[in-house]
């Protein structure tokens, strides 16, 4: 993730397999609820420093009061951990003893644009091209966490791979009372983003290799005026620096053949000109605290869903189908 220009602070940035659904449920009950249920679940453990080597790589920089998509990778001994059974605990840390307020499973979503360690790049004509080696980020863990007030919270992540021991990682986060980026249910900014017809060279507004003209045909404001749903991806493909940034533009591209006749797919670069110098006007209008982001905007111009950081086709397609009223 590139650094913000001077004066603009930037935050840091299918079900997991086991030996059956019963073991997954048993693990969740054991590590999330503890022997005494949600009210008593070893809240004191959250006050102890983590002593193991499990390191979370959080891709969600903005948490707000309400429900949140909390996405993260897990690093162990220098490698990203895939397909583990994972749960997340949320603690109120305002008192001397942290109080457990919620416990949720985290589902591992495998990236559909990674095959055998190589990055699958979708060209505008529909052909597939393998680039290698890909990042070792082949998927992402997602938990949906509730925060009922603004301020500090404690997060405990518990992970178990196969029959191995339960490993933990702990961190503190802050829930905002008011979001910076637009929330679902609010009107989308009526941005007049640059499109292909505005530039002599498409690479001026798309750092993908090669640039994809399908993602630069429609202005956000025009789609709203026409009552056309949108999938808008804010990303800088060439300069994705974070280990878990992921090929989000390629994930979006995979949906165009199926939904392109009903949905406007739009890509907006983060920077106007050289990276790190100035944000594009559309990015400033959307007040994004990080990148990448994907927003779904319905035919009324309301935001239906938002995804920060690494996102999989399965998550995105489910949201698109819901927006279109499809089963």
PLM region spans:
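Short active-site neighborhood of thiol/selenol oxidoreductases, capturing the structured segment around
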Residues: 201, 212, 220-240
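Thiol-/selenol-based redox modules, centered on thioredoxin-like
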Residues: 181, 304, 308-327
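Thioredoxin-like thiol-disulfide oxidoreductase module
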Residues: 269-291, 296-300, 322
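Bacterial N-terminal signal peptides
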Residues: 20-34
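Thiol-based oxidoreductase modules, predominantly thioredoxin-like and allied folds used
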Residues: 234, 260-276
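Contiguous segments within soluble domain cores/interaction surfaces
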Residues: 44-205
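N-terminal secretory signal peptides that target proteins for export/translocation
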Residues: 1-18
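Typically the conserved alpha-helix immediately C-terminal to a functionally engaged Cys/Sec
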Residues: 242-259
